[in-house]
């Protein structure tokens, strides 16, 4: 192949690459539930839940998720139980507020997109005495105060 053809081919590839738009997301964070996996350990002859992994994907257009300030709690988790009339927040259980370190985008853009896994330990099941199904509802707040959509784990049996 001649040098001219290679140069033209390189120019076309470079031009097409420059035309590809970078992904742009809303400045309000968006979450999408991925998975919830409970882990158990043996206590005597009984298997007892002791931790869980909650995984969700996120997008944020202005890239201000997380914080360098360890007192800024970006992730808010609320525990719900279904006692026969649909899922209701259990007011006896304190909400969980989680610090998320400042997240940075790969590349030159400001927008963020990725997957986040939160370990719930100790036991992800708050009330072992009841047999009611439970779920967690999760929301994130960015540094500008934008609150994401609320995501929920599927109903979990105890």
Predicted regions and their residues:
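Sec-dependent signal peptide recognition
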Residues: 2-9
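C-terminal motif of bacterial Sec signal peptides marking the signal peptidase cleavage site
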Residues: 15-18
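Bacterial signal peptide processing site
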Residues: 20-23
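First exposed extracellular module after export/assembly in secreted or surface-exposed proteins
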Residues: 28-158
């Amino acid at each position: 192949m001649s040098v001219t053809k290679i140069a033209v081919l390189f120019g076309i590839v470079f031009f097409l690459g420059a035309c590809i738009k970078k992904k742009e997301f809303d400045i309000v964070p968006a979450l999408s539930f991925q998975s919830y996996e409970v882990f158990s350990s043996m206590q005597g002859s009984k298997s007892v839940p002791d931790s869980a992994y909650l995984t969700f994907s996120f997008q944020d257009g202005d890239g201000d998720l997380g914080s360098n300030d360890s007192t800024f709690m970006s992730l808010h988790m609320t525990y719900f139980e279904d006692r026969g009339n649909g899922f209701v927040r259990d007011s006896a259980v304190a909400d969980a507020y989680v610090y998320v370190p400042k997240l940075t985008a790969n590349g030159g853009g400001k927008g963020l997109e990725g997957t986040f896994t939160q370990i719930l330990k100790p036991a992800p099941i708050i009330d072992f005495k009841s047999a009611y199904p439970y779920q967690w509802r999760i929301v994130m707040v960015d540094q500008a105060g934008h609150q994401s959509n609320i995501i929920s784990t599927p109903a979990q049996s105890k």
